[in-house]
Amino acid sequence: MPISLEHVSFTYMKGTPFEKTALHDVNLQIEKGEFVAVIGHTGSGKSTLVQHLSGLLHPQKGSVCVDGVNLNAKNAAAKKARNSVGMVFQYPEHQIFAETVYEDIAFGPRNKGLTPEETDRAVKDAMAFAGLDFETFAQRSPFRLSGGQMRRVAIAGVVAMEPDYLILDEPSAGLDPRARDGIFKEIMALYCKRGIAVILVTHNM
């Protein structure tokens, strides 16, 4: 089953002099296993779109469904559907909060109800995938890492949740060419290995 948007519209500060329409009558379907790029200039509504896909924003008109479940619903099925979508924000400091890298990555698996042993395994697997050596980084503060390393922590935190859909909002923003290439290699490796859907937001090709 896909993520589907049907006739979705969203306007910021509606009814004020600063009203700005970000989405107007958008229809979109993303199947599991697809790699989709959302490309547009700054301010074109890309981030607004993917925040609807992840359930962070709700449409003012239309509907967003994940695997046939409306994300606007307030029930266990909608919560499970939202948990199947992982999102890495443009700037990792927006979603990194714990005192150590380990605790930050472990937050999601614990929230899903995994046992301590399962959580530990999920953290180690996610760190290995993201290119973060466990012994070197597990007990370090994520806020003392480089931009590229912080981005890897953010990606590892989402990967540890094992989402069916992974949204990456400008994952290479602010990174040097080497770090950018490394991030994209990891994204492609995850896509090829797990067969999840990847939605990549960018302002350039």
Located regions from the model:
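Catalytic Walker B motif of ABC-type/P-loop ATPase nucleotide-binding domains
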Residues: 166-169
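ABC ATPase NBD Q-loop/coupling interface
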Residues: 63-80
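Conserved ABC ATPase signature
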Residues: 141-145, 149
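The feature captures the beta-strand-to-loop junction immediately N-terminal to the Walker
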Residues: 39-41
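Conserved catalytic motifs of ABC-family nucleotide-binding domains
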Residues: 162
